[in-house]
Regions:
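Glycine-rich, aromatic-bearing surface loops/beta-hairpins
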Residues: 114-172
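Amphipathic alpha-helical interaction surfaces
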Residues: 25-28, 46, 60-71, 85-96, ...
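N-terminal interaction modules that seed assembly of large macromolecular complexes
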Residues: 2-73
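A charged, amphipathic interaction segment
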Residues: 76-135
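A structural motif
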Residues: 3, 45, 53, 62-66, ...
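Short runs of predominantly hydrophobic/aromatic residues within well-ordered alpha helices
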Residues: 12-19, 33, 54, 58, ...
């Protein structure tokens, strides 16, 4: 909750990836706030006020996930809206002739994004969402200490450079929020 607020102000890509993880945590507890309260939140060193805030925040997200049909997969509207915002900014950067570094990073990452999208479950996601999914997937692999192949590493490197290109425009992205 506190991390999400901070990331939302500082780095929208990191915010989206964090929220993907939070959604997965909530799913792992079957969107049951009682289980989250008893098993997950005690892991943190919250004082009573912070614990109550965290409980309300997770409860709100769990309810949103249920109401919006994201109990098993997908993302809540607040996360999707942030992705749309990033996608809009992405299109603006691609159209800006002064953003040659961003454009170069994009065209280097594009073949990997297209390949990843082709390997998807048949649902054609926008390029930016595919890139975010790839970054989240590699994060999960690393958290689980699973090996990452050379091809995957090359793809993630190119996609990460695209994110770095976006971070260089952080001031303008933050102004959009």
């Amino acid at each position: 909750m506190l991390i999400a607020k901070k990331l939302r102000k500082q780095n929208l890509v990191a915010y989206v990836l964090y929220m993907y993880q939070v959604e997965d945590i909530i799913r792992s507890y079957k969107c049951d706030i009682q289980n989250i309260a008893e098993e997950y939140l005690p892991r943190f060193d919250y004082d009573d006020e912070e614990l109550e805030q965290a409980l309300q925040w997770y409860d709100g997200l769990a309810r949103m996930m249920q109401e919006e049909g994201c109990r098993e997969r997908g993302h809540v509207q607040v996360v999707r809206n942030t992705i749309f915002l990033l996608a809009d900014r992405h299109r603006e950067l691609l159209a800006d002739p002064q953003e040659s570094i961003y454009n170069a990073a994009y065209y280097k990452a594009l073949p990997f994004i297209v390949e990843l999208r082709g390997k998807g479950n048949g649902k054609m996601k926008p390029e930016l969402e595919t890139a975010l999914d790839a970054l989240y997937g590699i994060t999960l692999l690393r958290m689980q200490n699973k090996p990452v192949g050379a091809e995957t590493s090359a793809a993630i490197s190119a996609i990460s450079n695209l994110q770095i290109g976006r971070a260089s425009c952080r001031e303008r992205v933050s102004a959009c929020v």
